[in-house]
């Protein structure tokens, strides 16, 4: 799987539904790492709850803009940059890919993300869409969270594994009407039934 391509598509969908992730000051997911002092081994833990600045996810299911994101992270200085590990969890909303009914759940993703120090070997040998950057003693977690959530969520969410979907003829949710069916008209009589309208009941079902 081309994860780079998937990440770019996820990022594009996030931009279509709200603010982008490329903000180091305005984003609520910006973390000040000045206390680390670029000393390898220095670290701190981050346990916080923030509002999602944008809709994060896929077309049919996502974390809504403004939803609460629970951050449980370890932020550590290493030789090449700042390594962030831990988990992010948030509620999700969407619709069933089969019957279009509302789907609610919760997603938890694991983060392992390196942010390169300026002028480090990693900074000089990688692109920004490959490895994040430390900018003005801060790191922005928004894009890594967008990528991780997009890869974790199902492309075709369902309200239940055995959801029967919609009736292909009239669109009625089959789960709400287990016995739902349509009368079958012998194709030899179809044109006559159409011409007679309501008076054609006696012809229905004939073979």
Swiss-Prot record:
What domain of life is recorded for the organism?
Answer: Bacteria
One Pfam family hit: YceD
Which protein family is named in the record?
A: To M.leprae ML1660.
Among PANTHER family, the record links this protein to: LARGE RIBOSOMAL RNA SUBUNIT ACCUMULATION PROTEIN YCED HOMOLOG 1, CHLOROPLASTIC
Name listed for the protein in its UniProt record: Uncharacterized protein Mb2951c
Q: What is the lineage of its organism?
A: Bacteria, Bacillati, Actinomycetota, Actinomycetes, Mycobacteriales
